[in-house]
Design a protein with these regions (language model features):
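Active-site/ligand-binding-proximal alpha/beta "capping" segment
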Residues: 110-138, 145
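Patatin-like phospholipase A catalytic core
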Residues: 1, 95, 139-142, 146, ...
Length: 325
């Protein structure tokens, strides 16, 4: 999904991975045909930070209407300025209306709701809003260190309580995690597909004292009742076919060089369109420049199999050799 060291090109990578995850979740769980996107579908999640900030943008590229909850308004400001969310509001009513209006028209949108995800889920459930896809990307690897904000606290109150009353903060985190899980189960009963997105949310719920989240009803040795996105979506749809992240960087820092490589990659995939994964990747790289994915150096990520990586590398070498880039 992302990478370390010299392979890391910023959050663009997680946008592509999330785009693929959402599209294929729609196909596997919602019955969407391989040649269609998520138009007319609603995705709800939480988190607009360093990695989680990809969710709204990925949902838009995949064609979905989406609402992403985030308690830190500075994070929302970053994503809004960046163009990775299209709307922002602290009103549950307004956030829901914007998303549902776009969903009804089959148009994509990414609504950043400044508030707690549990408040959002309660509002949607009580107003009988059907959510097609649901996930979570709060920082549940450190829930008691500020990574998960308890319901009823603002972001600023959370920071103050964490400093002055960490034990009390932990109690509120556990209570909110338990209620968060209850709301997910209620949506699941209504047909929502929830998937774990690798942020330790399910483990955090278990650590809060919820044993029913475990497959064996007792402990986490056999895993959890909700699936991981890797085992349930990306594995069978992409990794099992050899598709994975392929990156290149234009060290000239010239956006025109990146544009030319995008065009070359799109032309190659279009000419060698073997399966629906290729079409998805074609759409991704065709629209990559328009979607303003670059952060920093002029780099691109594109899921490819071994054949695609090799042939694109040879094509780029040829372009350098001929002075095209």
């Amino acid at each position: 999904m992302t990478a370390g060291g010299w392979m890391y090109i910023g959050p663009q990578g997680i946008v592509h991975g999330t785009f693929n995850t959402l599209l294929n979740a729609g196909r596997l769980k919602l019955g969407i045909p391989n040649d269609q996107n998520l138009a007319g579908r609603l995705f709800v999640s939480a988190g607009l930070g360093g990695m989680s900030g990809a969710q709204g943008k990925a949902a838009e590229i995949a064609g979905a209407a989406s609402i992403i909850a985030e308690v830190d308004d500075s994070r929302i400001e970053t994503r809004y300025t960046q163009g990775w969310v299209s709307h922002r509001t602290d009103s549950l009513e307004e956030a829901t209306k914007i998303a549902l209006d776009h969903q009804k028209e089959g148009k994509p949108c990414a609504v950043a709701y400044c508030g707690n995800i549990v408040d959002l889920l309660e509002y949607l459930y009580n107003n009988n809003v059907h959510v097609d896809l649901m996930s979570d990307q709060t920082s549940c690897h450190v829930p008691y260190d500020g990574g998960y904000c308890p319901q009823g606290l603002t972001f600023e109150q959370r920071t103050e309580m964490l400093d002055k009353d960490p034990d009390g903060f932990r109690v509120l985190v556990d209570k909110t995690l338990q209620h968060h899980y209850e709301m997910i189960c209620k949506f699941h009963e209504r047909g929502t597909y929830f998937f774990d997105y690798g942020n330790s949310f399910l483990k955090a719920v278990y650590d809060s004292g919820v044993k029913s989240i475990c497959k064996n009803g007792e402990n986490d040795l056999d895993g959890f009742i909700f699936p991981s996105y890797v085992e349930d979506i990306l594995g069978p749809c992409l990794f099992d076919f050899g598709y994975g992240p392929f990156r290149w960087c234009c060290l000239s820092r010239n956006p025109e060089d990146l544009h030319k490589t995008d065009v070359a990659a799109a032309e190659y995939i279009k000419a060698h369109n073997r399966r629906y994964q290729d079409y998805d990747n074609y759409v991704w790289v065709r629209d990559a420049e328009k979607n303003k994915l670059v952060v920093g150096t002029q780099c691109r990520i594109l899921y490819q199999d071994a054949m695609g990586r090799m042939n694109l590398a040879l094509k780029f070498n040829e372009m350098v050799r001929n002075g095209e880039i």
